[in-house]
Curated annotation (Swiss-Prot):
<dbReference type="GO" id="GO:0005840">
    <property type="term" value="C:ribosome"/>
</dbReference>
<dbReference type="GO" id="GO:0006412">
    <property type="term" value="P:translation"/>
</dbReference>
<comment type="similarity">
    <text>Belongs to the universal ribosomal protein uL23 family.</text>
</comment>
<keyword id="KW-0694">RNA-binding</keyword>
<dbReference type="Pfam" id="PF00276">
    <property type="entry name" value="Ribosomal_L23"/>
</dbReference>
<keyword id="KW-0699">rRNA-binding</keyword>
<keyword id="KW-0689">Ribosomal protein</keyword>
<dbReference type="GO" id="GO:0003735">
    <property type="term" value="F:structural constituent of ribosome"/>
</dbReference>
<dbReference type="InterPro" id="IPR012677">
    <property type="entry name" value="Nucleotide-bd_a/b_plait_sf"/>
</dbReference>
<dbReference type="InterPro" id="IPR012678">
    <property type="entry name" value="Ribosomal_uL23/eL15/eS24_sf"/>
</dbReference>
<comment type="subunit">
    <text>Part of the 50S ribosomal subunit. Contacts protein L29, and trigger factor when it is bound to the ribosome.</text>
</comment>
<dbReference type="InterPro" id="IPR013025">
    <property type="entry name" value="Ribosomal_uL23-like"/>
</dbReference>
<dbReference type="GO" id="GO:0019843">
    <property type="term" value="F:rRNA binding"/>
</dbReference>
<protein>
    <recommendedName>
        <fullName>Large ribosomal subunit protein uL23</fullName>
    </recommendedName>
</protein>
<comment type="function">
    <text>One of the early assembly proteins it binds 23S rRNA. One of the proteins that surrounds the polypeptide exit tunnel on the outside of the ribosome. Forms the main docking site for trigger factor binding to the ribosome.</text>
</comment>
<dbReference type="GO" id="GO:1990904">
    <property type="term" value="C:ribonucleoprotein complex"/>
</dbReference>
<keyword id="KW-0687">Ribonucleoprotein</keyword>
Length: 95
């Protein structure tokens, strides 16, 4: 089993993700190889909450140019985690 800090990279801070907090849904950037069970276990272990649902989205990297050179940013994976009613993650409270 991988460490929870290897699975969860950082929270997603955007207008949409902050709006989802009211519905008890929290968004995280996660490791691209992580599956839903690993994400659920990592959130429950790190934040001491009960996870009801995990949804994942694979986000393709964007094409970038510097002069005549074309490259891409890295592909990422986002997870939207729904918590049991009444549970909260305190780090997101001020958003």
């Amino acid at each position: 089993m991988r460490d929870a800090r290897d699975v969860l990279k950082r929270p997603v801070i955007s207008e949409k993700s902050v709006g989802l907090i009211e519905e008890n849904k929290y968004s995280f950037w996660v490791d691209t190889a992580a599956n839903k069970i690993e994400i659920k276990n990592a959130v429950e272990k790190m934040f001491k909450v009960k996870v009801v649902d995990v949804r994942t989205i694979n986000v393709d990297g964007k094409k970038k140019r510097v002069g005549k050179h074309v490259g891409r940013t890295a592909d990422r994976k986002k997870a939207i985690v729904t918590l049991k009613a009444g549970d909260r993650i305190e780090g997101f409270a001020g958003l």
